[in-house]
Amino acid sequence: MTEQRTVTNNATHYFYPTVLLFSILLTGGVLTATSFYNKHLRQYKSAKDIPEAIFKKQWLYGKVTSVGDGDNFHFFHTPSGIFGGWGWLRSIPELQTVAFDASVEVPQSVRWWNKLFSAKVANYKSHFMSLHVPYKGRRNLPTISVRLCGVDAPERSHFGKTAQPFSDEALNWLRYKILGQYVWVKPLAVDQYGRCVARVELWSWLKGWQNISIEMLKEGVGVVYEGKVGAEFDNQEDIYLYEELNSKKAKRGLWSQRKFETPGAYKKRT
């Protein structure tokens, strides 16, 4: 009887530490897996889903699924890319391809006096509107609405207001540049419209990394953001101002107009 009690006590003595160790390992494994998922695999479906710790510190990877204006677009987040299962375990939205048709005339937001007095303006407009956008955007997807940081594109017609010159051209250029492409997005803030204000980078084997906001300024399809409240440049404001000045001196894009009103001034006036 005494021997049986001794064996039972010994079994109990070894059993409880084993259970405790197993519980610790299991809990640690669950916490580690959860942390790994949240950091590397969790998909953000709107700007409000992005944790505060991400802003101004980390980059998000994903696909541009639609471009609705000259300085904003919708971003389908694909965390960790192919290593996160995207494209083979997790589906990525496909965009409908658009065949190039040279016979189609595209509208241009050009005013009659620019046509009459400035051939350079017409040439720039023709160039931007002739850029072929190979995809048709898709809406109603679980995407983040992204506002390009540090820049302002000409205002399109909204709520009965007339469109600014080069607004259609800026939109077509941005669609040509990023629609259907995979980009890196660095969240900086959330604006009053619930959009993620972000620095956006596109990789090209020919051009390397391209900051889309800065590319807009180089092409002359946007200006440096004039608002004092909510302006975000990710510590690159000097570069933005430099590229805008270069385009202005060269009368490139929207700077080719004889009379030019910035988007900020236009919004205040109207």
From Swiss-Prot:
Enzyme class, broadest EC rank: hydrolase
EC numbers on record: 3.1.-.-
Alphabetized UniProt keyword annotations: Calcium, Endonuclease, Hydrolase, Membrane, Metal-binding, Mitochondrion, Nuclease, Transmembrane, Transmembrane helix
Membrane topology of the entry: Single-pass membrane protein
Organism: Kluyveromyces lactis (strain ATCC 8585 / CBS 2359 / DSM 70799 / NBRC 1267 / NRRL Y-1140 / WM37) (Yeast)
InterPro entries, per the entry: SNase_OB-fold_sf, Staphylococal_nuclease_OB-fold
Alphabetical list of PROSITE patterns matching this protein: TNASE_3 (PS50830)
PANTHER family, per database record: EBNA2 BINDING PROTEIN P100, SERINE_THREONINE-PROTEIN KINASE 31
Record field: transmembrane: 15-37
SUPFAM superfamilies for this protein: Staphylococcal nuclease
Similarity comment: Belongs to the LCL3 family.
Active-site residues per Swiss-Prot or TrEMBL entry: R147, E155, R195
GO molecular function: endonuclease activity; metal ion binding
Domain TNase-like: 58-257
Name under which the protein is recorded: Probable endonuclease LCL3
Sites where the protein binds Ca(2+): D152
Compartment annotation: Mitochondrion; Membrane
This protein's GO CC annotations: membrane; mitochondrion
